[in-house]
Amino acid sequence: MKLKIYLLLTALCFQVTCLASTDNEEKTTNRISWEGAISGDAWRTEFSYHYMLSPYYGFGGSIGRIQGLEDFTGGDGWLVDEDSQRPSHLYLSPSIHLDLPSIVKIGKIGIGLYAEPGLMLTIPYERINFEDHSMPYPKHEDRHMSSHGGNWAFFNVKAGLNIHVHKNLCFTVGYNFSTFDINTTRRTMKYNNKSIEPLLPKKENLHEITVSLVGYF
């Protein structure tokens, strides 16, 4: 059901932008952006490129990194190394970018709306280094655990305001919703053949505030 709703919204947005397109608009073919985002449990940064088929829609994608803000220190008898306490993921995100015409103009500044539905594709592998304290000191061991599978494809959709300060430059402020789980790979890990998932935060969807710098050429 969620997938059907997601695809329906994407199709409706696409149709609206097609109808809004006019032959008189100046066409820019390429859109590049740098985006930063923050949520309650992670920060994210990404670089994106979209080939604009019209001033209002285009296809492309982004590459980025997301890192958790909450430290995971381990469990009974084992202590996670400092450099492994916060989950971190690289990802690719194919997407459709939609720009609606400016709805407000203040001098030369135009303010409009944008939307960007897409996918978030991660590498289903992560490694945690830890000290095993189950043996008396000084017999502590340096060990590691790694993920085995787990979810790697997630839906996400961005929406917000375009603030055009020049025909080739704008800023955006928006919101991103994603089904991405920052601990997705860690939920498959085991310590002494026992899942560590009960020690991890409850799975939640991602809700972010985003800002970006955008160039058109």
Regions found by a protein language model. Give the residues of each.
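Cleavable N-terminal export/targeting peptides
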Residues: 1-27, 217
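Short loop/turn motifs that connect adjacent beta-strands in outer-membrane beta-barrel proteins
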Residues: 21-29, 55-56, 101-113, 165-171
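Transmembrane beta-strand segments that form the barrel wall of outer-membrane beta-barrel proteins
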Residues: 24-45, 59-66
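Hydrophobic, lipid-facing positions within transmembrane beta-strands of outer-membrane proteins
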Residues: 30-32, 43-47, 90-94, 153-159, ...
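Extracellular loop and loop/strand-boundary signature of outer-membrane beta-barrel proteins
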Residues: 31-35, 76-85, 141-147, 195-201
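Short sequence motifs at beta-strands and strand-loop junctions characteristic
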Residues: 37-41, 84-91, 145-154, 201-205
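Gram-negative (and chloroplast) outer-membrane scaffold detector with strong preference
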Residues: 51-138, 204-216
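Predominantly the C-terminal beta-signal and adjacent terminal strand-loop region
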Residues: 157, 162-217
